[in-house]
Amino acid sequence: MKVSVLITLAVLGVMFVWTSAAEQEDHGSDRRDSPALLKNLLGEEVFQSEERACRELLGGCSKDSDCCAHLECRKKWPYHCVWDWTIGK
């Protein structure tokens, strides 16, 4: 019984990957949801507003000022921005 369930799940997984690949091939290199395309359409001003003047949202950092508001640089490795447990402006 367990083997037949595992085989069924494996077949369904392979079919999903196969149909997804076929659908991607039908559409070609359609990049409608690409972040680069959104930046080109909306312009840099949308992504660089005064409110978002921070350098790192959740990426690497070396000091607290590298992170966005309400985030701080983690003190131990791996260094990245984490929530500093504050809310509000």
From Swiss-Prot:
Instruction: Tell me if DNA-binding is a UniProt keyword of this record.
Output: no
Query: Per its record, what are the GO molecular function terms?
Result: ion channel inhibitor activity; sodium channel regulator activity; toxin activity
Where this protein primarily resides, as one coarse class? secreted
* Cystine bridges: 54-68, 61-73, 67-81
Q: Which residues form the signal peptide?
A: 1-22
Q: Where in the cell is it found?
A: Secreted
Q: Which UniProt keywords apply?
A: Amidation, Cardiotoxin, Disulfide bond, Ion channel impairing toxin, Knottin, Neurotoxin, Secreted, Signal, Toxin, Voltage-gated sodium channel impairing toxin
Q: What GO cellular-component annotations does this UniProt entry give?
A: extracellular region
Name used for this protein in its record: Mu-theraphotoxin-Phlo1a
Q: Which organism is it from?
A: Phlogius sp. (Tarantula spider)
The top of its lineage is: Eukaryota, Metazoa, Ecdysozoa, Arthropoda, Chelicerata
